[in-house]
Curated annotation (Swiss-Prot):
It comes from Nitratidesulfovibrio vulgaris (strain ATCC 29579 / DSM 644 / CCUG 34227 / NCIMB 8303 / VKM B-1760 / Hildenborough). Residues 14-82 are annotated as: Disordered. One of its GO terms (cellular component) is cytoplasm. InterPro entries: AAA+_ATPase, P-loop_NTPase, Signal_recog_particl_SRP54_hlx, SR_rcpt_FtsY, SRP/SRP_N, SRP54_GTPase_dom, SRP54_N_sf. It is a peripheral membrane protein. CDD domains: FtsY. This is Signal recognition particle receptor FtsY. PANTHER family: SIGNAL RECOGNITION PARTICLE RECEPTOR SUBUNIT ALPHA (PTHR43134:SF1). Its main location: membrane. GO terms for biological process: SRP-dependent cotranslational protein targeting to membrane. The keyword Nucleotide-binding applies. Involved in targeting and insertion of nascent membrane proteins into the cytoplasmic membrane. Acts as a receptor for the complex formed by the signal recognition particle (SRP) and the ribosome-nascent chain (RNC). Interaction with SRP-RNC leads to the transfer of the RNC complex to the Sec translocase for insertion into the membrane, the hydrolysis of GTP by both Ffh and FtsY, and the dissociation of the SRP-FtsY complex into the individual components.
């Protein structure tokens, strides 16, 4: 969506306020300056008028932004051109607040308990005060309202996290401190069992050794292998840790956690492939059945749409009618376009015709699902080769990315799956699902070391917001239970 540019500059530190109690007046921002009109975005007939104290929504029906508002519900300030007290109070609160997404959202939602006219007007006023383009603001509010209605969410407590996630994506603020903190918390919770498997054993190792010696390395090898890091990656990792300890000139076990964290950060620093393409960007989703590929496609589509992209999903797994139906349901839920043929159709034909549709209808992103039948390895490889060939013929450079979806709970099987698909069609990125609650999180280290393929997203739950960009530093800290070293 690309709005809030002034606020993004403030958050990213391009402009620092001289006095922390008085935020900088960002260019073009009425919140950090002074509102000239005090009017919310959108005054068209289809938009509900602002309300100071509207009646709550009916228990069984959520008032959406599309619902009409009775004439007698329009407050005095809308009739006489004044500014309602809540607008003045909200503007002042936002100006004085710390420029963080969760803090600002807290002020916007202050006194709002459920979805309805009050929420829509406060969001519109918030956007208007930031001089957000009216059409973009209205699209955001409308789509969020429709999502609430579809999910049958009514109370703020049920959807606040989703609202913050949508704002973070729309603002490109996932690296903002609040969002990093939320992700770190999810990672820490999700890796609890893996951390217990590795962390507690490392604690015992450190407590039982006065210095880092051969016995120390032998015990560490056993710990890592038991944590699903695997024999070969463990051997490589210990070799690199030995060298790191030697360069640091230390044999003090107290330094070991920090050395391991630093090494893991290096391992996870594989550069992501960036392909400059003319739209649509074409992404091939691959992986065995049952790893969460369908929901991953839905979550990728959902993220892309919240970032302002038009998304088409193609059902390339034609060997299971249920797979086509399930993907269509998810496409409808997230509001993405959908293309499929009947069960048993040629997957390459589906990809080719979906490419036609994506080009002719102006889609920005095409996500192509594929089958994952490991018991027919030869046929699978041939099928993937054919899909890549027809996509490239139709749209030069396509597919621009091949994303492998792996289930973290499968442990060492993830390595054989990565090897198979990398040989079949090449893997550019990996999405690791079901990382929450597994004791086999060490497989992340194994995959990164053995193949050097960047892990771009991790699944930390069932909600749309629970698939987040992978950050190697955060993962290492959450895995080992160590804090980030403060900058010098």
């Amino acid at each position: 969506m690309g709005f809030f540019s002034a606020i993004k500059r403030l958050w990213k530190g391009d402009t620092a306020p001289e006095d922390v109690s008085k935020p900088v007046e960002a260019e073009g921002s009425a919140i950090v300056g002074t509102s000239s009109t005090g009017s919310p975005v959108g005054t068209g007939a289809a938009m509900p008028a602002a309300q100071d104290a509207p009646s709550p929504a009916a228990p069984h029906a959520i008032a959406t932004p599309d619902d009409a508002v009775p004439d007698d519900a329009v407050p005095d300030d809308a009739v006489h051109g004044g500014e309602a007290p809540w607008k003045t109070e909200l503007t002042l609160a936002l100006r004085q607040a710390e420029p963080r997404l969760s803090v600002w959202l807290g002020h916007v939602l202050d006194g709002v308990d459920e979805a309805g006219p009050i929420l829509w007007e406060r969001l519109r006023f918030f956007f208007s005060s930031l001089e957000v383009p009216a059409d973009e603001a209205e699209t955001f509010v409308r789509d969020f309202g429709r999502w609430l209605e579809a999910m049958e969410y009514r109370y703020v407590a049920d959807f606040r996290s989703e609202l913050q996630y949508r704002l973070a994506l729309a603002l490109d603020l996932e690296d903002e401190e609040d969002e990093r903190s939320r992700l770190m918390l999810k990672l820490t919770e999700g890796l609890a069992r893996t951390r217990e498997q590795i962390g507690r054993r490392i604690d015992g190792l450190l407590a039982s050794h006065g210095r880092i010696d051969e016995g120390f390395w032998e015990e560490l090898e056993e710990i890592l292998i038991m944590a699903d890091v695997g024999f070969e990656p463990t051997t490589q990792l210990i070799g690199r840790l030995r060298e790191r300890a030697r360069k640091a000139g230390t044999d003090d076990p107290a330094r070991f956690r920090e050395l391991l964290r630093e090494e893991l950060e290096v391992i996870f620093r594989a550069p992501r492939r960036i392909a400059a393409v003319n739209p649509p960007e074409v992404v091939l989703l691959i992986g065995v059945n049952g790893v969460g590929k369908t929901t991953t496609i839905a979550k990728l589509a959902y993220r892309a749409q919240l970032q302002g992209r038009k998304v088409l999903i193609a059902a390339g797994d034609t060997f299971r009618a249920a797979a086509i139906e399930q993907l269509e349901i998810w496409a409808k839920r997230v509001g993405a376009g959908f293309y499929a043929k009947t069960a048993g159709a040629d997957p390459a034909a589906v990809a080719y015709e979906a490419m036609d549709k994506a080009v002719s209808e102006g889609y920005d992103l095409l996500l192509v699902d594929t089958a994952g039948r490991l018991h027919t390895k030869a046929n699978l490889m041939e099928e993937l080769h054919k899909i890549r060939k027809v996509l490239g013929r139709k749209h030069p450079g396509a597919p621009h990315r091949s994303i492998l979806v792996i289930d973290a709970t499968t442990g060492q099987n993830a390595l054989s799956q990565t090897k198979l698909f990398n040989e079949a069609c090449g893997v550019d990125e990996i999405v690791l699902t079901k990382l929450d609650g597994t004791a086999k999180g060490g497989i992340v280290v194994a995959v990164a070391m053995q193949f050097g393929i960047p892990i771009t997203y991790v699944g930390l739950g069932e909600k749309m917001e629970d698939m987040r960009p992978f950050n190697g530093s955060d993962f290492a800290m959450a895995l080992l239970g160590v804090e980030e070293k403060p900058a010098a």
